[in-house]
């Protein structure tokens, strides 16, 4: 059965379908190993590290006039727009078909091993792909299109193994089920920020299969930083280099776009092709962002922040919450914990001695943020080992509604202790916790929700010289961390522990995530993460192979409606 047709030429705009690709017929055709490099002049060292022309007619754009020397240059909107213009010119100069697609190595310089593909077909098709590299697991995905079947296609292919020959097979399927395939080769560059391309696998306690998706490994202590997408076999399938700090989390909107922090003053919005579409730059504001940010339904990002003025004048850090308007980029402070908890600030006079804020005052150290009902904010305060619920009053000013934590920490701190919910049952509170996660369920009553967290179970609290966590916590503190899940009942002003299990100890950082009926846990200071069953049985552990032992967070995403269908 022959279903091959000539594929027509289409000038494909980058504003058009962000992530469409097509393949169709069964033809296993190896293209020549011709390399096409657009630049005739020397590219910068960074560009050379992020692109490769090795493979089957692989194009590399000419960046020589763009003065790209560092990742901060890559994440400038003006640079991205010039890259887009050059890519459009290349598209218009090509007769891109399914059997001879336009292939460009990492054109926007935001994914070291990524490929841009563009082509058109006479007949509407949907596209899938498989990547094979000798000695490595295969990687197969269905690509996201704006329509299920389409004739104009452009995509980012992720999943190539760095610095080895990858055979990429595209499959196009028509609406009546007919298929066509084509193949090409690509050898990406080495990863630009790490010498390791995989994580060590170990220790299985359950034979359940791992969930579908890629682990986003966020934050390390390497000189050059990146966020990595890691498959279930432990291999890095994408490297997204950043400027400094860490990406905190990946946040998606409904327009097939992803927000990613690239520094402590900049969050960018990327489309599925890897193109930077918006830059939220706080460099000229009074704020540095840290730890966490989320998207609300008012076209705003809500972010944890440090006031530069307060840091300089009073020494206070990591105690503000701001909103960033995505339309106007206006930054508004919505919470200042010095004003919300003045009695605590009178008590918490100890100087930070252990973290990156050494030498400053860190009375609350807000490290995680969740949005409960588009108004109520749930925040994790590491330094007080407390989760706080904030809600705006009639004037729109956020106030502390209630708290969850050890009452011993709040004894003698004004009337703050009266805000604590009652603990239902006998269990030890969390200490130094990170990464809270809010969830609802159909079987819960009004006013009830689940709250999961990584209980670091740490006894470090530099801000309070009047009490010692070591004297308050139980004997496991400082030895074993825990995954914990609470059922919170706002109507009875109480909460209870419904699930808990031990995980490797990490005094700082770390994360938990409830994902596809499994639990993802990162013990950051041991540079290890694992996927567990819903009952706490380990399915697989992943451990960083380098000597640097630090992973800020690990969250898993399926990337559906972004890269994949």
Walk through the language-model features, giving the residues of each:
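N-terminal Sec-pathway targeting helices
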Residues: 1-13
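N-terminal processing/targeting junctions
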Residues: 9, 149-150
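N-terminal leader/presequence segments that precede the conserved core
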Residues: 13-19
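Membrane-interface motif at the C-terminal end of an N-terminal transmembrane signal
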Residues: 19-36
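Short extracytoplasmic/periplasmic juxtamembrane "stem" segments immediately C-terminal to an N-terminal membrane anchor
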Residues: 35-50
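Histidine-/acidic-rich catalytic cores in large beta-rich domains
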Residues: 48-51, 55-127, 131, 152-154, ...
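Solvent-exposed serine/threonine-rich low-complexity stretches and specific carbohydrate-binding patches
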Residues: 134-148
């Amino acid at each position: 059965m022959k279903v091959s047709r000539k594929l027509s030429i289409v000038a494909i705009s980058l504003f058009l379908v962000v992530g469409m690709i097509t393949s169709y017929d069964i033809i296993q055709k190896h293209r020549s190993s011709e390399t096409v490099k657009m630049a005739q002049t020397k590219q910068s060292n960074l560009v050379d590290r992020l692109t490769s022309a090795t493979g089957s007619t692989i194009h590399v754009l000419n960046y020589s006039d763009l003065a790209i020397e560092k990742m901060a240059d890559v994440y400038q909107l003006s640079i991205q727009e010039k890259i887009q213009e050059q890519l459009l010119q290349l598209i218009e100069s090509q007769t891109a078909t399914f059997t001879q697609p336009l292939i460009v190595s990492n054109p926007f310089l935001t994914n070291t091993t990524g490929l841009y593909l563009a082509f058109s077909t006479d007949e509407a098709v949907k596209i899938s792909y498989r990547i094979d590299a000798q000695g490595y697991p295969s990687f197969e995905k269905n690509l996201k299109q704006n329509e299920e079947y389409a004739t104009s296609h452009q995509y980012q292919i992720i999943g190539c193994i760095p610095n080895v020959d990858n055979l990429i097979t595209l499959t196009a399927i028509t609406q009546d089920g007919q298929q066509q395939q084509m193949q090409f080769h690509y050898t990406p560059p080495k990863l630009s920020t790490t010498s390791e391309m995989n994580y060590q696998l170990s220790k299985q306690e359950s034979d359940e299969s791992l969930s579908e998706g890629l682990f986003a490994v966020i934050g390390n202590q390497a000189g050059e930083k990146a966020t990595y997408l890691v498959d279930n076999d432990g291999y890095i399938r994408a490297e997204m280099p950043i400027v400094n700090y860490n990406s905190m989390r990946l946040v998606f909107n409904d327009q097939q776009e992803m927000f990613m922090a690239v520094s402590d003053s900049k969050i960018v919005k990327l489309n599925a092709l890897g193109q930077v579409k918006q830059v939220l730059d706080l460099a000229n504001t009074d704020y540095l962002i840290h730890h966490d940010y989320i998207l609300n339904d008012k076209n705003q990002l809500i972010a944890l922040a440090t006031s530069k003025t307060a840091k300089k004048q009073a020494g206070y850090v990591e105690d503000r919450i701001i909103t960033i308007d995505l339309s106007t980029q206006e930054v508004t402070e919505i919470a200042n914990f010095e004003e919300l908890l003045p009695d605590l600030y009178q008590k918490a006079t100890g100087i930070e001695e252990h973290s990156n804020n050494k030498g400053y005052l860190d009375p609350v150290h807000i490290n995680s943020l969740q949005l409960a009902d588009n108004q109520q904010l749930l925040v994790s305060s590491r330094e007080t080992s407390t989760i706080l619920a904030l809600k705006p009053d009639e004037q729109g000013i956020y106030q502390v509604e209630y708290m969850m934590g050890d009452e011993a920490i709040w004894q003698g701190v004004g009337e703050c202790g009266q805000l604590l919910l009652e603990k239902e049952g006998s269990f030890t509170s969390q200490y130094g916790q990170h990464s809270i996660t809010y969830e609802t369920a159909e079987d819960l009553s009004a006013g009830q929700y689940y709250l999961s967290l990584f209980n670091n179970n740490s006894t470090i609290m530099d801000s309070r010289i009047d009490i010692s966590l070591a004297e308050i916590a139980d004997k496991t503190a400082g030895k074993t961390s825990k995954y914990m899940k609470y059922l919170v009942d706002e109507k009875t002003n109480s909460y209870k522990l419904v699930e808990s299990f031990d995980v490797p100890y990490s005094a700082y950082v770390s994360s938990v995530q409830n994902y596809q009926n499994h639990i993802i846990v990162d013990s950051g200071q041991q540079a290890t993460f694992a996927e567990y069953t819903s009952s706490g049985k380990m399915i697989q552990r992943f451990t960083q192979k380098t000597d640097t032992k630090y992973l800020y967070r690990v969250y898993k995403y399926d990337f559906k409606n972004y890269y994949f269908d």
